[in-house]
Structures are given as structure tokens and as C-alpha cells.
Amino acid sequence: MSDADSPAPILSPDREDGTIEDFTRIEDLADHVDETVTLKGWLHNQRGSGGIKFLILRDGSGFVQCVVPQDAVDADSWAVADDVRQEAALEITGSVSADERAPGGYELQVDAVERIGESGDYPVTPKEHGIDFLMEHRHLWLRSESQWAVMRIRNRIETAIHEFFQERGFLQTDAPILTGNAVEGTSTLFDLDYFDDENAYLTQSGQLHGEAMAMAYGKVYTFGPTFRAEKSATRRHLTEFWMIEPEMAFYDLEMNAQLAEDFVAHIVQAVLEDCEEELEALDRDTSALEQVETPFPRISYDEAVELLRSDETAEMIDERIEALNEEKAELLEEKEENQTRRGQAKKHVKRKIDAREIEINKRVDEIEEALRNLPDWKESAQTFEWGEDFGGDDETVLTWHFDRPVIVHRFPAEIKAFYMKRDPDDDRLAMGVDVLAPEGYGEIIGGGERATDLDFLKEQIEAHDLPEDVFDWYLDLRKFGSVPHSGFGLGLERTVSWITGRDHVRETIPFPRTIARLHP
């Protein structure tokens, strides 16, 4: 076959600059001021009238205002801009200009607008929606600015996690998702039929396998999904969530605690440095995050119980109740004044008043819920008995005493897992360590020093009514070069919830799985 008869190449060889994309990302506009660029994305919102339109375009990397004067574009472009609907896909070409007033600090003076994909009646409009509606439309709600910001921060947290461990010589390893044994108790296992009539379970934790890998590689961490068939409908619980679990050979409890606090501080600092725009989009008060410096306060379980039952805690809760009642009264007074003003107001003022009323109603609902809960939390704290595990409400109250995460250590052995080492100075206690996030968010890390005594572990497996044969491989770790070792697990979604200021973990993972939700 002659060259003339050869088919045209499928791929263009013209990639001397190494680029793949033939368009510009919104996050890169700072590099193109006074240049003409082409953007591709979706219409987030719009406004304007007469001979000018303001289109807010989003592309996953950010948001930008595109200014479309009718006299600066051709008829086809104006027809698109004048009739475009929310979430239509667009290609927009124009000149980049810096403008501090615009979203992201830049805007596009448009030369041309082309529709790539039409949008129908988009259900998730800018108005207020109930949480059930939003969760039913989670696949679309993810496109909103708030959810964009949460997922961008989640991504930065994930990259910060890998940075932290890789810089410290850890090996990332992978634990199995299908297991033949329980880790955190049999009552929360998702079980399924395996081959040859054997039972298998979705993993509750990668910790046991992490211990095996720590004995092979020294310092390891796993990063994967975990599953708990726990019928809890609280703001902190999911049935499927992601855990980061380091395991370290030759680490004792104190070394473990120091690593945990350095880890949390590193994550927070990474988000503060790199996610300013996203935190602002969420209206997150960063003053509390800026307090996250090591060392963290440390209290024993015994001291935590004393603090819960103290007069100081009772007075603190009473003061919160009083402050919330005052805030509620002020908000209701403002709402009444706004309703009086609204009757004589112009249309644009009415829109502002209506938007403010939505904010007031939402905050009043939050206050009323808190006022219903706080008396119960006070009673729970005042009557807390030694030997009980801290509930979410107890953790919330404890964190109100501190301006940064607090480390709680040495728990009653009965409330900790079978593999936890006992305190050599008090056999009632396990060498556990938890990290509680401030601002009422509670536990984000749980861990401790692992038991190394073979006979003790056998006794604990029997005491917890677990089948020893499925733990034979785990017990082998104590027979061949057993050493002191420790580890912990950080719940990714709880950490994202705290750092982003979300009230519920369901907003911190793209498609949450709860006891009430398996779709979308």
C-alpha cells in the first residue's frame, strides 16, 4: 500500500507541549489574565436583563462569572445566553479579567457561547430544599457549591493523609474487604455466603491484618472502606465509611498518641493552607481550626468521668441554655421586624428579607433542637457511671471544655476490644487512646497498644465468645517474634464533617449508606 493509500492517523501527533485538554480550567484563570480562553462546564446560576447576562459557570475546579453583553456577541451566542437553563453544558470563550468582587476573583468577558448539552427542569433549584429531597437527588445535589466544597476538602484531606505517612517512612498496604472473622464484635457484622458453605463478612476494620503487615514491614497504613451493621441513626454513623489505620511495630501507647496528634494537626493545616475558597463557600469559621496545634490536652478516662460529673460541666450547660434562649428571642424579634418592613419594600429588598427569613427559621430550628437535648445531656453527664462507654452526647460535652482536640486514654477493659493490652499498673484498664475533635464533634480516632501475650489473647477470645480457630493466623503473630506494637483508626467522614463544619456525616461522602438509604 502506498503512502497515499494509507488511512489517516487516528491520533493527532501535534502534542509537542504535552497538553491533553483543549480548554482552560476555571482554577487556572489566574494564569491567563488579559488572555482569551475557552471554558467548558455547566451553568450554575444566572441573572441579568435587557442587553446583558451574567452566567455563573462551574467546571468542577471552581466557579466563574461570565459577562455576556448582547452587543459583543453574535446572534447565536446571545440566543443561547438568553435562553439557557440551570445545569445546561456550555462552551464559553472570552477574555479573563481580575475582579475582586467576582466569584473566585476573576471573570470572563464573553466573546462566544455555545450549548453542548441541554438541561430540562432541573430539580435541585437554588431555593431551600428538605434533606430527604436532597438525599433522593444526591446524584444531582453533588453539583451544588456546598457539596463541591465538601468534596474538594475531602480530597485534600486524603492527599494530606498520604503525604503524612509517606514522609514518615510508612508503607501503604491493603487489607481484605472480605474476612472470615470479626474485629469489633459480632453484633455489627454484615455476613454473606461464601464458597463451600463458609461464612464471610464485610470488614469492620483492617487492623488485624495491619498488625500482620507491621510485623513484616515495620510501619504500615491501610486506607479503605469498612462496614458496620449498626442500627444507629445518629449524625455520626454510616453503615459504609472509610478508615485510615496505621500500625507500628515497637510503638507504645505514648508514641501512638504522639503520632495521632501530629497526624490530625497535619491534616488541619493542609486544609487551612490549600482550601481557603472551599472553606469560605461553606461559611466555615476557621478560628477553631486555627487553634489545632500540638500537643493536644491529655486526660485519662477517670479524669473524663470526673469532668462530666463536675459542677463546672453543669454550669457550662446551663450557660449554653441561657445563651441559646437569648439568641432565639433576638432572631424572632428580627423576623417580626423584617415582616413589618416587607410590606412596603421593593422587590429586590423583599428577596433579601425572604432569604434572611429562611436563615432565621433554620437557625431557630437548630436552637430548639439543642434546647430539647441539652437538659438530657446534662442529666447524662451528671449521672455517668464509671465503666460505661462514652456516648456521642458525652463526647460532645467533653469537647466543649477544650479549644482543640483532646486525647482520652486508659479505658475500662470491658468496653474495649479483645486485642487491647491491659494497663500494667491497673488491670481494670485497657491501653486505649481516643482523639475527640472539638466543637462538639467527638471521636475521630480510636486506637491503642495491642496485647502481645499469647495466653492472654486466647483468654480474651474465649471471653468474647469468638471462635479461636478463625484467629489462628492472628495468634501466630505472637508466636514468631512478637514485639510491642500500636495503632489507631481515623474515620474519614467524621474528620471531614468536623473540618467542614457539617452537621451530619451523610454530606461528607458522595453516596452515603445508612440504615435508611441504599440509593442512589
What would you call each of these model-derived segments?
Residues 1-520:
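Class II aminoacyl-tRNA synthetase catalytic cores and aaRS-like
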